């Protein structure tokens, strides 16, 4: 069960709220990630990092002061700093961070792997910087999408991703 301030909102999508950059935030994330790593032996831990709307950070005097304190260029650089901080927790346990291609914006953690959902450009950019990449472009490689229009097809989201489409990629 999630604590009330971290409970599910009842819907999914892109939301404008980003994590605070306080030490308490990282303590919470460290606890969650350590529990995940205790349960799952995978070398890679996917932390997301996509669709992080920066409006809340731009409007926050506290966050702007943090950007200045850390001598960062902008909110993208702050997201990079944030993700690198999370990556340190993973590295301490011998794990590797993997995140969506938006983590390229602002700079990557040294051992980060990029999972490129917006096409091949993010994968190419990450590879040119010496990072491992995984191609997972939307919609063709989203395997939670429906695979046919058949009435027997289980409910899925978004477009139909047929076997032919996947193999053609």
Enumerate the predicted regions with their spans.
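Substrate-binding groove of N-acetylhexosamine-processing glycoside hydrolases
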Residues: 22-44, 51, 65-169
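Aromatic- and acidic-residue-enriched carbohydrate-binding clefts of CAZyme catalytic domains
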Residues: 1-24, 55-76
């Amino acid at each position: 069960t999630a604590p009330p301030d971290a409970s599910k909102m009842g819907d999914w999508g892109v939301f404008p709220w980003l994590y605070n950059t306080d030490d308490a935030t990282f303590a919470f994330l460290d606890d969650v990630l350590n529990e995940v790593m205790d349960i799952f032996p995978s070398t890679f831990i996917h932390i997301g990092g996509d669709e992080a709307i920066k409006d809340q950070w731009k409007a926050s005097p506290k966050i702007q002061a943090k950007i200045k304190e850390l001598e960062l260029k902008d909110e993208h650089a702050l997201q990079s700093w944030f993700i690198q901080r999370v990556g340190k927790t993973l590295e301490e346990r011998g794990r590797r961070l993997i995140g969506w291609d938006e983590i390229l914006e602002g700079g990557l953690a040294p051992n980060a792997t990029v999972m490129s959902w917006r096409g091949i450009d993010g994968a190419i950019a990450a590879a040119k910087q010496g990072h491992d990449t995984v191609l997972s472009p939307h919609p063709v490689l989203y395997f939670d999408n429906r695979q046919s229009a058949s009435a027997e097809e289980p409910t899925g989201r978004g477009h139909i991703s047929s076997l032919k489409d996947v193999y053609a990629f």
